């Protein structure tokens, strides 16, 4: 073998070893000829631009030669955090060439993502709001701080939102449409419902937060993974230009088969400082089989019923971080009025809304919110499911602190029934003072909790300072926080 031939073969072997690969999507519903391409970490913008030009060139050549795939090519480009990539329609020859490029980390077939909720019935009383500000099920009042999420923006990555619904009070706006159907409205109802739970005046948790509609699912409640990633990318860029990613929340009441690309995109948004609440899924199976629920850095939410049991449909397992009300949840519907839906899709916006509420109240970053909600929650959920490491049901902290902070009573709406004012709590009898023993000083008074959301004896103790001092970075805490429960 000649030396030049040997060198040529060796270089080819090195190139193949460093090239990306096409991932298998298992049982996920793939979209024919549609692919997501993720570049390797460290790829420069210049390299990315050259790669895209090269892809367009070989794609045009292959399509012209074979006469395939009209209107194909790159459809979405991703560039936020350390993630660079794109998605589009490509023939087999082109995608093989792309996967062989050493700059490519992996190529993933595009799949269909769907909503995690279903319509059950109209006009039934909602209970979720009252449950998250009470220690016990069956209460009727929702107690919350008057800050109510003010200054926080929540991105509804869903089927769209009826931004003109009166319950949003002008705080809803249209962001973008990744479906490209020319229909910038919610033709399904799912997105409007989840948005109402997050920020609605009547049905919402963060009643003063803003919501931005990011349409990634069609009127049937489904859409491509590539469009979901593009939606996350858009949210991160929009937030960075409008108030900052540290004051932004993304709710994703959707999911599909396991996707490395989608999980990677979600992780990049968290790294940017955003809080991501994600539905665990409605298949009564391990949530690790679904994306983006299987991504470690997001806050994955299971659903609970009115008796605090895990909802029968809710996914479970180590990926689940928290539970929230998800059965028979009443919220807004397109065109006005309300409707009831069930699903982890309904649980996730409770967490997204509460995340916005806590971010506004305490000024914490998005990456710290999931752990904070674990601290505030109650260990209430029965039958959390096999391998689930938590039984925590979310709580806004009011019940734990006797409602001592500035708060507003409210009752979840009931059709044709006026709101019920909050009943004042019974005053407690003061305990009899104890006489000190002879020769002993009088005991000091017990410390009184001042901050309604701090589960420690007094406000002088700062958990974040303590953690950083003795255990290192927020990254360490975020990575291993899910094992505290």
UniProtKB/Swiss-Prot annotation:
Range of residues in the leader sequence: 1-19
Pfam family, one: Inhibitor_I9
Compositionally biased residues, Polar residues: 377-394
UniProt xrefs under InterPro entries: PCSK9_ProteinaseK-like (IPR034193), Peptidase_S8/S53_dom (IPR000209), Peptidase_S8/S53_dom_sf (IPR036852), Peptidase_S8_Ser-AS (IPR023828), Peptidase_S8_subtilisin-like (IPR050131), Peptidase_S8_subtilisin-rel (IPR015500), S8pro/Inhibitor_I9 (IPR010259), S8pro/Inhibitor_I9_sf (IPR037045)
Residue ranges annotated for the Inhibitor I9 domain, each copy included: 34-116
Prodomain positions: 20-116
GO function terms (MF aspect): serine-type endopeptidase activity
UniProt-annotated stretches for the region Disordered: 377-462
Positions annotated with a glycan in the UniProt record: 251
All copies of domain Peptidase S8, residue ranges: 126-400
UniProt record similarity statement: Belongs to the peptidase S8 family.
Name used for this protein in its record: Subtilisin-like protease 1
Organism: Arthroderma otae
């Amino acid at each position: 073998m000649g030396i030049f031939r040997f060198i040529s073969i060796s270089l080819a072997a090195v190139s193949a070893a460093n090239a990306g690969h096409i991932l298998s999507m298992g049982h996920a519903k793939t979209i024919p000829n549609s692919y997501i391409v993720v570049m390797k970490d460290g790829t420069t913008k210049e390299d990315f631009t050259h790669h895209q030009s090269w892809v367009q060139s070989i794609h045009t050549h292959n399509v012209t030669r074979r006469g395939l795939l009209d209107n194909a090519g790159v459809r979405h480009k991703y560039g936020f955090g350390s993630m660079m990539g794109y998605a589009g329609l490509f023939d087999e020859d082109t995608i093989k060439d792309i996967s062989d490029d050493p700059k490519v980390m992996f190529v993933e077939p595009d799949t269909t993502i769907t909503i995690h909720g279903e319509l059950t019935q109209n006009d039934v009383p909602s209970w979720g709001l009252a449950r998250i500000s009470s220690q016990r099920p069956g209460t009727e009042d929702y107690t919350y701080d008057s800050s109510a999420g003010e200054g926080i923006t929540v991105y509804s990555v869903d089927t769209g939102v009826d931004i003109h619904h009166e319950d949003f009070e002008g705080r809803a706006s249209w962001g973008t449409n990744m479906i490209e159907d020319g229909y910038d409205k919610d033709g399904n109802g799912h997105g409007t419902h989840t948005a109402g739970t997050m920020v609605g005046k009547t049905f919402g948790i963060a009643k003063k937060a803003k919501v931005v509609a990011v349409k990634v699912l069609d009127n049937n409640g489904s859409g491509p993974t590539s469009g979901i990633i593009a939606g996350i990318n858009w949210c991160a860029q929009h937030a960075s230009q409008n108030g900052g990613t540290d004051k932004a929340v993304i709710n994703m009441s959707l999911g599909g088969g396991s996707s490395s690309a989608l999980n990677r995109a979600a992780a990049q948004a968290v790294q940017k400082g955003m809080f991501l609440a994600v539905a665990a899924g409605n298949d009564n199976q391990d949530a690790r089989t679904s994306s983006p629920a299987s991504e470690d850095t997001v806050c994955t939410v299971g659903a609970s019923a009115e008796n605090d049991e895990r909802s029968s449909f809710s996914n479970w397992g180590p990926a689940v971080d928290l539970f929230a009300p998800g059965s028979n949840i009443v919220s807004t519907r397109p065109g006005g009025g309300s409707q009831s839906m069930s699903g982890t899709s309904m649980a996730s916006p409770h967490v997204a809304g509460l995340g916005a509420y806590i971010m506004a109240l305490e000024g914490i970053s998005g990456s710290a919110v999931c752990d904070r909600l674990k601290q505030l929650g109650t260990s209430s959920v029965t039958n959390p499911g096999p391998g689930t490491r938590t039984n925590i049901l979310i709580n806004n902290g009011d019940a734990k602190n006797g409602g001592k902070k500035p708060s507003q009573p409210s009752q979840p709406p009931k059709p044709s029934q006026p709101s019920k004012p909050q009943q004042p709590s019974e005053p407690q009898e003061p305990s009899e003072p104890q006489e000190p023993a002879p020769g002993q000083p009088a005991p000091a008074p017990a410390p009184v909790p001042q901050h309604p959301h701090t589960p420690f004896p007094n406000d002088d103790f700062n958990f974040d300072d303590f953690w950083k001092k003795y255990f290192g970075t927020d990254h360490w805490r975020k990575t291993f926080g899910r094992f505290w429960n």
